[in-house]
Amino acid sequence: MNFGKKVWLIGNSSEKSKKTLNKLSKILKAEHFVFDDINPEIVISVGGDGTLLRAMHMYEYQLDRVRFLGVHTGHLGFYTDFTDEDLFEVVEALYDENPAQAIHYPLICVQVSFTDGYQIVRHVLNEATIRRASKTMVGDVRISDYLFERFRGDGLSISTPTGSTAYNKSIGGAVVHPRVKAMQIAEIASLNNVVYRTLGSPMIVAEKDTITVCPAPEDDYSLTFDQLTFEYKNIKSIEFSLDGTTISFANCAHTPFWERVSKSFIGEVE
């Protein structure tokens, strides 16, 4: 018996995902799982990594009591352990799933402070980025209390270890195992010449350190929190930290990290 385990399903708009979600819903209902979108124990994403990220942000303020499981219906699913052909295996895994054995990945806490004193706080699973809405971005970068550099360029990306395989990798960042509790800063098209100078390489920042970016407050900026994009003015500072918040994945046939990396980017090695 599943003892009325509460689940909720979130899918993307593709026809394949819709069909998979409907089929899985029927199987779960037949097995007497309880569907609860307010206080689910397990959120099942059906689609790809973007769907999983959307699901995480929908339950961003319940992460201490929600676990996630991914079913991918496309070509690449870094956060997903099952395919659309594994639906009965999904049900078996949900029966066997033990909350005490959940897999936890760290999230980055992003605190945005504005010149009028207003603040917003978000958490990201992959990365947060800051860019100028137009022209070159200029901003001081502090590591904890130390003024490290004055950055000039298109922008900055700050990623988690699991997010190191996403946008961070595409701009030359390193791939970092989730057991390494750290953040990574990667530059987006920095200016480096005889007048302006940045480090010019990705940086791994330790767990207890904070990263603070102080951009010119009069400019317009585009901030992303994973797949979410917002436009802001009058930003005083943006602080990035590992505050202990994690996302929990149901430990159901969970694929080891390096196996995920190999399958996602390299394929079969002969």
From Swiss-Prot:
The active site is at residue 49. Coiled coil: none annotated. Its main location: cytoplasm. One of its GO terms (biological process) is NADP biosynthetic process. It is found in: Cytoplasm. Its cofactor is a divalent metal cation. GO terms for molecular function: ATP binding; metal ion binding; NAD binding; NAD+ kinase activity. Keywords: ATP-binding, Cytoplasm, Kinase, NAD, NADP, Nucleotide-binding, Transferase. It catalyses: NAD(+) + ATP = ADP + NADP(+) + H(+). Pfam families: NAD_kinase, NAD_kinase_C. The keyword Transferase applies. Involved in the regulation of the intracellular balance of NAD and NADP, and is a key enzyme in the biosynthesis of NADP. Catalyzes specifically the phosphorylation on 2'-hydroxyl of the adenosine moiety of NAD to yield NADP. This is NAD kinase. It comes from Lactococcus lactis subsp. cremoris (strain MG1363). The lineage of its organism: Bacteria, Bacillati, Bacillota, Bacilli, Lactobacillales. The gene is nadK.
